[in-house]
Amino acid sequence: MADNIQPPIEFETPRLRLRQWQGSDLAPFAALAADPQVMEFLLPVPTRADSDALAARIRARIAGQGWGFWAVEHRESGEFAGFTGLNVPLAALPFSPCVEIGWRFARKWWGQGLATEAARAALQVGFERLGFDEIVAFTALGNLRSAAVMERLGMREDLDGAFDHPAVPEGHALRRHRLYRIARPKLG
């Protein structure tokens, strides 16, 4: 995998800039994280202090290894839209070790294809620059919006890979997750 490779921390798509986190991202990230619709399939809804601490951990990971959950900025407006990127999950998942792709966008940006656009660029970095052989994604069973993004990215559901997420309490409606996978495209 990509321990010593330092890809560019910032890269662009036609409408987005994926970059290192800045202090100006903290307030809009906290607002995104406090939105019950955004957090519908995630636990728990964080406090402002929790949100700031998460942003600091993400920023430190990018600073240390060159990649992670990049802040997503809308190029035309300059606004923070959310985050997208790659991560090695800390939880002991049944399919670990792995690299996951994930995203979270403010509701203002939903329905415009931005999550797919940003995630497609992150996958490209993961495969072409970092050399990962496979990237996974997972979500609670009921999160059909994220599952649809995974499918638009060309990811396929691992029908034998459904699992109970260890960070979600037993008996909670969000505990059961579906698993998607995508392999590095083969050339020629």
Located regions from the model:
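Acyl-donor (CoA/ACP) binding surface of acyl/acetyltransferases
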Residues: 1-41, 73-188
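Conserved GNAT-fold acetyl-CoA-binding loop/helix
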Residues: 37-59, 68-70
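Glycine-centered flexibility motif
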Residues: 66-68, 85
